[in-house]
UniProtKB/Swiss-Prot annotation:
EC number from the UniProt entry: 4.2.3.4
Protein name (Swiss-Prot/TrEMBL): 3-dehydroquinate synthase
Cofactor(s) this protein requires: NAD(+); Co(2+); Zn(2+)
Gene3D superfamilies in alphabetical order: 3.40.50.1970, Dehydroquinate synthase-like - alpha domain
Length: 368
C-alpha cells in the first residue's frame, strides 16, 4: 500500500493506493467524523463493491444511495435524489458521504457534500482508472448543463481518497482506455520521462499487470497532487490539467453526454491540441506523431467525430470555463512535457486546427 498527500494546509488529505483496500476499516475510520454514513454509488458499481465496503463501515449507520449509471445522469434531477434520501433519513452535519464509483459518482457526491447543510465530510472511493488518476483528486465537484459540461459545481476537498486497484479487474476495456487518456496527459503536460515509461509499459497497463498499474496511478496522482497543492482553485498552473479538454468537452456536449466517454473525448481532443501546438511551431511533427501513436496504442480514438464542423466546435468552446473576458484560452504544448495556457494565438491557426483532416493524419502514421 502506498500513501500520497495533497498538501493544502489544514485541508490536506491522504491518497491511499493499493489492492484490496475496500473492505479494510483502517483506511476509512480516521476520516469519518460521526456515526452516520451515506454511500453514494450507481447501479453498476453497487452490486460489485457495496457489500465489501460495508465490511469496512461496521459500527456505523449506513444509508446506501444507488443512482442510475452514466454521464447522462450527471444532472440536477439525479443530484436531487441524493438530497431526497439524506433529508428523508434525517442525516445531519456529522454525516460522511462516501463516493463509491467513477467520475460521475465522485463529482455528484462531492457536490452534494459541498451543498448539504452547507458542507459535510466526504471520502472518494474511485473505481475506474479515470477517476483514480484524475477526478477523485483535487476537489472539483459538480454536474453538467445541457449547454456545457461541468459548468455547475464547487471546489470541495475530500477527507481522503481510497484507491483500491482491485476494482479495475471488473472495468470494461473501453473504460480502461478512457482512463489512460488522463494518465498520458500527465506525461504530455509536465513529465516527458513518463511518456517514455508509458511507451515501454503500455501493453502491461492494458493487461492490468498490478505493479505497473499501481506505478502509473501513483505517478499520475503525485503529479495531480503537486499541481493542486500549488493552485487549488485553478487560477494558474492547474488549468494545464485540462489539456485536450476544451476540444473534448465540445465533443461530449455535441454528441450527447455519455455517447463518447469522457476519456475518449479527451483523447481526440488531445490530438487536436497536439496538432494546434504543431501549427504554432511549438511542437515538431515527430513530437506530434509520437503523442498520437501513444494515444492510439492506449485504445483511444484519435479522430474527432466526422460530422462535427469547425462551427460546431466553436459554438461549444465558447462556453468553456477557461474563457475569460470573452477570450478563449487553450492548453497547448511547447514541447512534450511542457504545457502552457494561452489565448495568444492567431484565429486562423485555431480555424485550421478545427478543419484538419484527422482521419488522413492518423492514416499516414500507419498501424502499430
Amino acid at each position: 500500500m502506498r500513501t500520497l498527500h495533497v498538501d493544502l494546509g489544514e485541508r490536506s488529505y491522504p491518497i491511499y493506493i493499493g489492492e484490496n483496500l475496500l473492505g479494510d476499516a483502517r483506511w476509512f475510520a480516521p476520516h469519518i467524523v460521526g456515526r452516520r454514513v451515506a454511500v453514494i454509488s450507481n447501479e453498476t458499481v453497487a452490486p460489485l463493491y457495496l457489500e465489501t465496503l460495508l465490511k469496512a463501515l461496521q459500527g456505523h449507520e449506513v444509508t446506501p444511495v444507488v443512482l442510475p449509471d452514466g454521464e447522462a445522469y450527471k444532472q440536477w434531477e439525479t443530484l436531487q435524489l441524493i438530497f431526497d434520501v439524506l433529508l428523508k433519513e434525517r442525516h445531519d452535519r456529522k454525516t460522511t458521504l462516501i463516493a463509491l464509483g467513477g467520475g460521475v459518482i465522485g463529482d455528484m457526491a462531492g457536490f452534494a457534500a459541498a451543498c448539504y447543510q452547507r458542507g459535510v465530510n466526504f471520502i472518494q472511493v474511485p473505481t475506474t482508472l479515470l477517476s483514480q488518476v484524475d477526478s477523485s483528486v483535487g476537489g472539483k465537484t459538480g454536474i453538467n448543463h445541457p449547454l456545457g459540461k461541468n459548468m455547475i459545481g464547487a471546489f470541495y476537498q475530500p477527507q481522503a481518497v481510497v484507491i483500491d486497484t482491485a476494482s479495475l479487474k471488473t472495468l470494461p476495456s473501453r473504460e480502461l482506455s478512457a482512463g489512460l487518456a488522463e494518465v498520458i496527459k500527465y506525461g504530455f503536460i509536465c513529465d516527458e520521462p513518463f511518456i517514455t515509461w508509458l511507451e515501454a509499459h503500455m501493453d502491461a497497463l492494458l493487461a492490468l499487470e498490478p505493479t505497473v498499474v499501481t506505478e502509473a496511478i501513483e505517478r499520475s496522482c503525485a503529479a495531480k497532487a503537486r499541481v493542486v497543492g500549488a493552485d487549488e482553485r485553478e487560477s494558474g498552473v492547474r488549468a494545464t490539467l485540462n489539456l485536450g479538454h476544451t476540444f473534448g468537452h465540445a465533443i461530449e456536449t455535441q454528441q450527447g453526454y455519455g455517447v463518447w466517454l469522457h476519456g475518449e473525448a479527451v483523447g481526440a481532443g488531445t490530438v487536436m491540441a497536439l496538432e494546434m501546438s504543431h501549427r504554432l511551431g511549438w511542437l515538431s511533427a515527430a513530437e506530434r506523431d509520437r503523442g498520437i501513436r501513444l494515444l492510439r496504442r492506449a485504445g483511444l480514438p484519435v479522430v474527432p467525430p466526422a460530422e462535427m464542423t469547425a462551427e460546431d466546435f466553436m459554438e461549444h468552446m465558447a462556453v468553456d470555463k477557461k474563457v475569460l473576458d470573452g477570450r478563449l484560452r487553450l492548453v497547448l504544448l511547447q514541447g512534450l512535457g511542457n504545457a502552457v495556457v494561452t489565448g495568444d494565438f492567431p484565429r486562423e491557426i485555431l480555424d485550421a486546427t478545427l478543419r484538419t483532416d484527422y482521419r488522413a493524419l492518423a492514416d499516414q502514421l500507419g498501424d502499430e
